[in-house]
Amino acid sequence: MSEKLAYHANCWGPLGGHPVGVTSVKDLFYVTFGDMRRAFADIAAAGYQAVEVFDGNLLEHAGDIGQFRRLLSDHGLSLLSVYSGGNFIYPDILDDEFWRIEKAAALAAEAGAVHLVVGGGAKRAGGVRDGDYERLGAALDRVADVAAKHGLSAHYHPHLTTMAETPDEIRHVFAHTRIGFCPDTAHLAAAGGDPAALIEEHYDRVTYVHLKGWQRDPFAFTPIDRGDLDLRPTLEVLDARGFDGWIAVELDFWPDPLDGARASRAWLQQHSKVS
């Protein structure tokens, strides 16, 4: 199995959207409101090789991507992936959403990233309408085209609160798109799925994986060494398949982010062939 390990920098501050995005769809980038220098130092100290960041955190360095790359290299890290997203089902705003995704992809490529990950597929107040999955699928194909233009691999990240929560909903999405699949183990399990089984089912789309722990009651995301989600079957599937892509550990919040990163790294050392 892969020995390439990354960590998402989202744990080092609260998640929000760029404030300009309140009145401008094209500017609604994700942002971790935290100190990325500290995040990168901690991620390196915990033993990871690369990072994933939100598109808005990369946008902060749009005038000098070289500075961002130096910030990473100072800690012996590289940028692996950038995360973005969209509603993807409302034709009137789609071009503005893709202005943002195009910007994110261009900056990601300039910063040396390999992957572009997107979430989304809005759930309407009145529920999913006929044609919404087709619209989402077409938009995700467009994401894949944008990513390819910039030399990136594109992946869809099924997520709670979107049109792709349950295994059946995920199948419905993938019936309408050719984009890759970035499984997030916690989101898949929390929606009633079996992460290992879903990775096996859609393995031909999987070249990048998010590992995250999950606690059922009270609901919480956790380091992967605790909670109610046993990730050993997921690692077994990846190992049996000879997976050689990157694995990113993700954790949305933890009181001590460095402690959480170290705990997950130690668990991986104990339970997988990752060293």
PLM region descriptions:
Residues 7-11, 53-55, 81-86, 118-120, ...:
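A cross-domain feature marking catalytic cores of carbohydrate-active enzymes
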Residues 108-129, 248:
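Active-site groove signature of glycoside hydrolases
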Residues 31-32, 53-65, 87-97, 124-128, ...:
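Acidic-and-aromatic substrate-binding clefts and catalytic sites of carbohydrate-active enzymes
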Residues 77, 113-114, 152, 241-245:
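A short helix->loop->beta-strand "cap" motif at the edges of active sites that frequently abuts
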Residues 4, 50-51, 141-228:
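Acidic/histidine-rich catalytic cores of soluble enzymes
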Residues 1-109, 141, 148, 152, ...:
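N-terminal pre-domain/capping segments
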Residues 64-68, 96-102, 129-140, 167-168, ...:
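Charged helix-capping and loop-helix junction motifs
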Residues 45-48, 113, 206, 243-244:
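A structural motif
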